[in-house]
């Protein structure tokens, strides 16, 4: 194969990077891109033999035509030699490269394991599986002078990536919104052109026009004696500490001045031996946090600390920390096996990571790794070190704090960006505690072991805090272009800037601010104005309470169902039409419009599709097939500038958003057609005409781009039924959504792993839409929430739980029905719940005749009746009384706990509780009185009625006499009627057979003529009978009846 001279710009870029300790990026396009990897690695190593040779190769599932298993590769070579397809010692450069170099292969899904490691070269294949998180996580592991290589498949134009379907897009699609636009890919490709250390080449190393480093020139050789000012300062610091031990030996290990000062701060805290003290170290990636912690642990050992515990999300992340512990030991003169022993984990998941170090030089000392959840083993701890605290859930980090020295390190803007959450929440709480203790007493500097008895009570509730930050990178040189490019691309290092106009003139009233729709095509077009506005939006996200990650940027840009809105102050004409800084950013996701068939299939299988969080969740929780067919918008994020928080801007943005979707800004005239504000996509015809070597990839013309911001009247809204939100429940956030008329319908029973908060879903029905379904959902939610308060929601404060219950009642105000079927308690229901003995006990307790524990079994039911609105308005409790009843009755907390929670004395809490029971006892007594009263006749006392102001009629004798006569006449007629009916019954009971006429047809025939005449004349006819009947006398009838009565008496006597 003929050799070809490579472009001189390629070795120039690599050598410049090695010389200046800056990284380089190569994007190789082509199916044979892997064959150029050995060449690039060789150029890097030839520039400086001291360079890190190790290689990180990250991929999705399969490597590019080879296996990472050494034995499998050897077996394959043996088979090929047997077949005769290759010579015995034949090996191409690529095979030699993967066989001889130290390559760490890692799946993208397992890339967390590489945190804390450093490599000289990073190879990323399977571009379609790349995400912003993966880019930041892998690129940050490369040291200064190293190379990042991105491998792309063959294509005729890089613009094909604009329309490329990424793996993550599958999660963005929903049933109603499936058209994904890869805006992030376009912005990524355009950003390569502005990266001065990036070359885009084909698989034959021809430099393509897009390359940002296409004009690179070799730097003049660097003189060996030449040192930058920072290094000179560090050298002076090390020399000044040579006589101070052990600080001098340990600081000599530091790489930057920043790191040296951090180590000295740690040593100061260690030497003070202070209880309840926290040292928080925050920095970006590659600043030497783990190294500083490792050196400080070595200092703690030299100061005699016996029980040192180290924790991190995984022991594999502590590789650098333990490495520098041992470097510190070496500097202090410790020897392995003589002064200390190293114990590795036998757990296969931990990959033989170090989990324990036993030191036995002066006395027994231990450095022990613990899982973050094992905070209960810290009883004897003297020093606890938390590395990568941002990746550990906040509640767990809080549990790790105790009466001992705590060192905490966290990344504030790295691959996950979770350190912002840590700095906003945990460090802010510690800072507040520190300020509070400072106001309470001036003795806040040190609590030493000598006088700890004297001051222990003072500091039992607060921790002192010392904050350290590192800003000088160690892996690579300060001002590394790749770091700048990555921070700009993923908006990692955005900071919020105060508005100078507001400082002089004050903030505008919320009613003067307007909401605008952000056009995402323009926002992610990589134009300078758009980039500036995007950074301001992301700065609001980062400074808010949300946990941020780079992946959120791709969600914002590519997800088809997502929309962006910003609240802007009034535009000042003096600013020359400049877009003002946003006060509030809202990101929404359109959800719903799911077919009933899809819902039915998912519910029957117990599964749900991706996206459409609220529809699927509510359908699953309430087993309702109808709800998912409604269309709604979930507010994914709403971030207000913290400088102007609690000024009503967030509520104003929600109000305008609600008005927008209710159609209050829509132009209803028929002749106005809405404009199409989307940009033209790259077509197949356009791509077919291009050639990779002549591919002109550049920014879109600003004139062809749609406006960045659109008025609400310019963009017609989707027809929605409701607005919804899903967030981690905190008291302040719940208060905000409650004040904006949102109603809770779901509260997750298990807390979120990262934040420790329970996910809450709240809904708000838009005006003019059917709302009865929300009333029913809220009623069902309240019933379930009351039942679960003694289980997973037991840890809620009573005030927080009470606030949730009150917000669920707000749904009744939205109902079309004036009356609600909240059935109040009745006597029958009361008898089913409580026995007379129970009511007597309650009555005795309310009269202070019994102890609180005697009625303990009744309190849960009493609380359930009250909060279930079964007592109506008859029992009215104040807010504090309601909180006490809820805490004791539903959360099953004891009196002391609720007294401490409400900041009340215990005796006052008991007195208020007794007052609650008295009210309920009176209500039950009144209920029983009413039920008995209903069974009694209604006696009306004229004197009392006259006192009540009722009109009393005077007595009229004539009227009474007439009424009496009417009553007598009516009674007489009733008596006569009854007597007649009785006579009729007697007649009917007589035997009339003896009066029957014989059935003699001859006699009837003879008398027929006389019968017809009698019938016409309505007269009487006499018929002749065969024999004359003897007439019965009254005496005969009397004797017969008397005999009949005597016979039964005789038979009874005979029986006796």
From Swiss-Prot:
Domain N-acetyltransferase, chain residue ranges per copy: 566-706
Enzyme Commission number(s): 2.3.1.-
Annotated compartments: Nucleus, Nucleolus
Protein's UniProt keywords contain Protein transport: no
GO CC annotations on file: 90S preribosome; nucleolus; preribosome, small subunit precursor; small-subunit processome
Polar residues composition bias: residue spans: 433-446
GO molecular function: 18S rRNA cytidine N-acetyltransferase activity; ATP binding; snoRNA binding; tRNA binding; tRNA N4-acetyltransferase activity
Function: RNA cytidine acetyltransferase with specificity toward both 18S rRNA and tRNAs. Catalyzes the formation of N(4)-acetylcytidine (ac4C) at positions 1280 and 1773 in 18S rRNA. Required for early nucleolar cleavages of precursor rRNA at sites A0, A1 and A2 during 18S rRNA synthesis. Catalyzes the formation of ac4C at position 12 in serine and leucine tRNAs. Requires the tRNA-binding adapter protein TAN1 for full tRNA acetyltransferase activity but not for 18S rRNA acetylation.
Name of the protein: RNA cytidine acetyltransferase
Species lineage: Eukaryota, Fungi, Dikarya, Ascomycota, Saccharomycotina
């Amino acid at each position: 194969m003929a050799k070809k001279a490579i472009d001189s710009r390629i070795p120039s870029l690599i050598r410049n990077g090695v010389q200046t300790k800056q990284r380089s990026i190569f994007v190789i396009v082509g199916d044979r891109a892997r064959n150029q990897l050995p060449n690039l690695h060789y150029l890097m190593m030839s520039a400086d033999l001291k360079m890190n040779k190790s290689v990180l190769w990250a991929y999705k599932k399969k490597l590019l035509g080879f296996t990472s298993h050494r034995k499998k590769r050897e077996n394959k070579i043996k088979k090929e030699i047997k077949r005769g397809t290759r010579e015995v010692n034949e090996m191409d450069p690529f095979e030699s490269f993967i066989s001889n170099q130290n390559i760490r292969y890692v799946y993208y899904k397992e890339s967390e394991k590489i945190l804390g490691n450093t490599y000289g070269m990073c190879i990323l294949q399977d571009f379609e599986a790349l995400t912003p998180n993966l880019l930041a996580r892998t690129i940050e592991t490369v040291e200064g002078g190293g190379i990042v290589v991105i491998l792309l498949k063959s294509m005729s134009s890089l613009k094909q990536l604009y329309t490329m379907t990424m793996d993550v897009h599958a999660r963005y699609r929903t049933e109603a919104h499936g058209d994904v636009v890869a805006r992030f890919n376009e912005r990524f490709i355009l950003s390569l052109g502005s990266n001065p250390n990036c070359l885009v080449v084909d698989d034959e190393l021809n430099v393509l026009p897009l390359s940002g480093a296409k004009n690179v020139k070799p730097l003049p050789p660097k003189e060996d004696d030449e040192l930058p000012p920072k290094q000179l300062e560090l050298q002076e610091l090390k020399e000044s500490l040579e006589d101070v031990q052990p600080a001098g030996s340990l600081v000599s290990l530091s790489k930057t001045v920043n790191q040296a000062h951090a180590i000295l701060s740690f040593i100061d805290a260690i030497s003070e031996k202070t209880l309840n003290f926290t040292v928080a170290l925050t920095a970006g990636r590659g600043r030497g946090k783990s190294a500083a912690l490792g050196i400080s642990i070595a200092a703690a050992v030299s100061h005699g600390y016996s029980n040192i515990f180290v924790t991190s999300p995984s022991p594999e992340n502590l590789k650098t920390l333990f490495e520098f512990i041992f470097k510190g030991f070496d500097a202090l003169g410790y020897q392995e096996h003589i002064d200390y022993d190293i114990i590795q984990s036998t757990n296969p998941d931990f990959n033989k990571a170090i989990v324990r170090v036993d030191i036995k030089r002066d006395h027994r000392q231990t450095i022990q790794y613990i899982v973050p959840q094992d905070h209960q083993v810290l009883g004897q701890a003297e020093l606890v070190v938390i590395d990568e605290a941002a990746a550990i859930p906040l509640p767990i980090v809080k549990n790790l704090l105790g009466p001992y020295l705590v060192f905490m390190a966290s990344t504030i803007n790295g691959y996950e960006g979770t350190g912002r959450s840590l700095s906003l929440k945990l460090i802010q709480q510690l800072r507040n505690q520190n300020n509070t203790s400072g106001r309470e007493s001036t003795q806040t500097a040190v609590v030493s072991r000598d006088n700890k008895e004297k001051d222990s009570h003072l500091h039992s509730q607060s921790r002192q805090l010392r904050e350290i930050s590192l800003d000088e990178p160690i892996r690579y040189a300060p001002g590394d272009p790749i770091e700048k490019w990555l921070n700009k691309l993923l908006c990692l290092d955005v900071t919020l800037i105060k508005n100078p106009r507001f400082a002089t003139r004050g903030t505008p009233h919320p009613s003067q601010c307007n909401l605008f729709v952000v056009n995402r095509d323009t926002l992610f077009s990589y134009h300078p104005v758009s980039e500036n506005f995007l950074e301001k939006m992301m700065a609001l996200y980062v400074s808010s309470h949300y946990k941020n990650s780079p992946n959120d940027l791709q969600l914002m840009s590519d997800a088809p169902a997502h929309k962006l809105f910003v609240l802007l102050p009034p535009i000042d004409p003096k600013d020359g039409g400049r877009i003002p800084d946003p006060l509030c950013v809202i990101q929404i996701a359109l959800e719903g419009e799911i077919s009933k068939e899809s819902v039915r299939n998912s519910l029957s299988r117990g599964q749900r599709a991706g996206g459409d969080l609220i529809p699927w969740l509510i359908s699953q929780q309430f087993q309702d097939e109808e709800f998912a067919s409604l269309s709604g918008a979930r507010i994914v994020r709403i971030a207000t500038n913290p400088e102007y928080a609690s000024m009503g801007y967030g509520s104003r943005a929600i109000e305008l958003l609600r008005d927008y979707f209710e159609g209050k800004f829509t132009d209803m005239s028929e002749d106005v057609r809405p404009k199409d504000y989307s940009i033209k996509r790259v077509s197949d015809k356009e791509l077919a005409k291009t050639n990779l070597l002549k591919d002109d990839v550049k920014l879109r013309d600003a004139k062809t781009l749609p406006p960045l911001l659109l008025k609400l009247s310019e963009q017609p809204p989707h027809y929605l039924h409701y607005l919804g939100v899903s967030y981690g429940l905190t008291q302040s956030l719940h208060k905000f959504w409650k004040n904006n008329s949102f109603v809770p319908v779901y509260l997750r029973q298990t807390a979120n792993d990262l934040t420790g908060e329970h996910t809450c879903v709240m809904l708000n029905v838009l005006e003019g839409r059917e709302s009865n379904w929300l009333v029913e959902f809220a009623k069902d939610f309240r019933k379930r929430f009351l039942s679960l308060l003694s289980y997973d929601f037991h840890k809620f404060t009573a005030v927080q739980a009470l606030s949730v219950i009150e917000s669920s009642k707000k749904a009744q105000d939205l109902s079309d029905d004036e009356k609600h079927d909240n059935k109040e308690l009745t006597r029958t229901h009361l008898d089913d719940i409580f026995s007379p003995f129970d009511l007597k006990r309650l009555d005795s307790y309310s009269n202070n005749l019994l102890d609180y524990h005697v009625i303990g079994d009744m309190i849960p039911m009493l609380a359930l009746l009250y909060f279930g609105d079964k007592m109506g308005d008859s029992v009215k409790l104040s807010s504090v009384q309601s909180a006490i009843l809820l805490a004791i009755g539903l959360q099953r907390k004891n009196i002391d706990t609720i007294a401490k929670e409400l900041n009340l004395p215990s005796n006052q809490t008991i007195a208020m509780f007794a007052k609650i029971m008295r009210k309920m006892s009176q209500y039950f007594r009144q209920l029983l009185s009413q039920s008995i009263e209903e069974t009694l006749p209604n006696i009306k006392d004229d004197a009392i009625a006259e006192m009540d102001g009722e009109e009393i009629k005077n007595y009229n004798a004539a009227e009474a006499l007439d009424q009496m006569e009417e009553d007598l006449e009516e009674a007489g007629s009733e008596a006569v009627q009854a007597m007649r009916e009785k006579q009729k019954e007697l007649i009917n009971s007589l035997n009339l057979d003896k009066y029957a006429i014989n059935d003699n047809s001859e006699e009837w025939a003879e008398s027929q003529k006389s019968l017809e005449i009698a019938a016409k004349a309505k007269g009487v006819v006499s018929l002749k009978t065969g024999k004359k009947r003897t007439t019965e006398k009254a005496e005969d009838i009397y004797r017969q009846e008397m005999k009949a009565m005597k016979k039964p008496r005789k038979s009874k006597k005979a029986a006796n």
